[in-house]
Amino acid sequence: MNIAVVGLSHKTAPVEIREKLSIPEAKIESALTHLKGYPHIQEVAIISTCNRLEIYAVVTDTEKGVVEITQFLAEIGHIPLNVLRRYLFTLLHQDAVRHLLRVSAGLESLVLGEGQILAQVKNTHKLAQKYNTISQLLDRLFKQAMTAGKRVRTETSIGTGAVSISSAAVELAHAKVTDLSSKKIAIIGAGKMSRLLVTHLLAKGSQQIAIINRSQRRAQELAREFPHLPLQLYGLEEMMTTVAASDIVFTSTGATEPILTKTLLTEVTITANSLMLIDISVPRNVHTDVKELAQVQAFNVDDLKAVVAANQESRRQMAREAEALLEQEVEAFELWWRSLDTVPTISCLRSKIEDIREQELEKALSRLGTEFAEKHQEVIEAMTRGIVNKILHEPMVQLRAQQDIEARKRCLQSLQMLFNLSVGEEYS
């Protein structure tokens, strides 16, 4: 068996490809079930964010398992395989392990060190557990990744002052118009990203902010987090009139199709000399045809790279500190994985000794007579179990701790020969 990851990210694919392969949480269950149904995939988990889609799998045949995942991606994205392969990356075993730990630590993010990805990794693990598509290997790997992500944030300074997608979007707007305090701003969406947008806009002095959202309850919840700011709340039926009256519009919704198009914008009268649309959603909320309108400037997540780059150089030394720490976590996972080849032998030996214990206990109790056996069986049972456990404990600890692969293999072979054990090789 092997661990593989097949995916694409902001580093390998533009937003127009990423949005085709984005899997919303509502469709994760069916995607996981579909993947688990392939003959060479034993465990599977999916990370799907605006900047990456990565499928982690335990495969019984590496080449065939990778082909199955690639075929799945081509099908859901309706992208020909020969086109899709240009944008995909595939990593195996230790490289796949290291990659997930780097993702969890924010080292693979568009915004180096950003913290939101750790929560997304946790959610990936939770969903895979919920839908029963991970078992021993991926469960341990994701737990190791979450530990690594937490350690990087507590033991290094990489998360300090990190920009986020939301803050980068506000910085982009600020760079284009300089004075945000005088601008009318609309935010379409009322989720976490929208809340962060409001926070960063307030820091830039913005006061005229409107929230447009399908659910008024969620919009009101967001507004309650900013009691000193008179946020204006609108439903989707007022979206276009609110957009037309704004100078800058941020979009951050879970819509799978564009909600702002050239056609919709031409149907309203734009009051500003120039309307700036900044779309931080994947799939995109703003259609590319809006750029054909003279009054409109449109940007998406890929346009944030220049803003982020200015923040990156000062963080590279911090990233090197984090990488050293991550190597410790990679090694910890590798040691655990290598120790799995001892499990079948240990289980087989324990089972054989337990059979002997039960047989000898039954003989002893029959000799002691019914009355004595009934009165003292529990004590005798506990004593014999204790003897077995104490005899096995030290050899088992030493066997698991043996880091030299060849030395451990010789120990296992000796045990199998001396005790006449028939052992499969489930994890080797």
UniProtKB/Swiss-Prot annotation:
Residue runs in coiled coils? none
The record's section on InterPro entries has: 4pyrrol_synth_GluRdtase, 4pyrrol_synth_GluRdtase_dimer, 4pyrrol_synth_GluRdtase_N, GluRdtase_CS, GluRdtase_dimer_dom_sf, GluRdtase_N_sf, NAD(P)-bd_dom_sf, Shikm_DH/Glu-tRNA_Rdtase
Q: Which molecular function GO terms apply here? A: glutamyl-tRNA reductase activity; NADP binding
What does the record list as GO biological process?
chlorophyll biosynthetic process; protoporphyrinogen IX biosynthetic process
Reaction(s) this enzyme catalyzes, per UniProt? (S)-4-amino-5-oxopentanoate + tRNA(Glu) + NADP(+) = L-glutamyl-tRNA(Glu) + NADPH + H(+)
Top EC class of this enzyme: oxidoreductase
Q: Which UniProt keywords apply?
A: Chlorophyll biosynthesis, NADP, Oxidoreductase, Porphyrin biosynthesis
Chain positions of site Important for activity: H99
UniProt pathway annotation: Porphyrin-containing compound metabolism; protoporphyrin-IX biosynthesis; 5-aminolevulinate from L-glutamyl-tRNA(Glu): step 1/2; Porphyrin-containing compound metabolism; chlorophyll biosynthesis
User: Which residues are catalytic?
Assistant: C50 (nucleophile)
**What CDD domains has UniProt attached to this entry?**
NAD_bind_Glutamyl_tRNA_reduct
Q: Which residues are recorded as binding NADP(+)?
A: G189, A190, G191, K192, M193, S194
Entry annotated with the keyword Hydrolase: no
Recorded E.C. number(s)?
1.2.1.70
Iron keyword on record: no
Q: Where along the chain is substrate bound?
A: T49, C50, N51, R52, S109, E114, G115, Q116, Q120
What superkingdom heads the lineage? Bacteria
Further comment found in the protein's record: During catalysis, the active site Cys acts as a nucleophile attacking the alpha-carbonyl group of tRNA-bound glutamate with the formation of a thioester intermediate between enzyme and glutamate, and the concomitant release of tRNA(Glu). The thioester intermediate is finally reduced by direct hydride transfer from NADPH, to form the product GSA.
What NCBIfam families does the annotation carry? hemA (TIGR01035), PRK00045.1-3 (NF000744)
Which protein family is it in? Belongs to the glutamyl-tRNA reductase family.
Entry's free-text remark on domains: Possesses an unusual extended V-shaped dimeric structure with each monomer consisting of three distinct domains arranged along a curved 'spinal' alpha-helix. The N-terminal catalytic domain specifically recognizes the glutamate moiety of the substrate. The second domain is the NADPH-binding domain, and the third C-terminal domain is responsible for dimerization.
Q: What does this protein do?
A: Catalyzes the NADPH-dependent reduction of glutamyl-tRNA(Glu) to glutamate 1-semialdehyde (GSA).
Fill in the subunit field for this protein.
Homodimer.
This protein's name: Glutamyl-tRNA reductase
Identify the gene encoding this protein. hemA
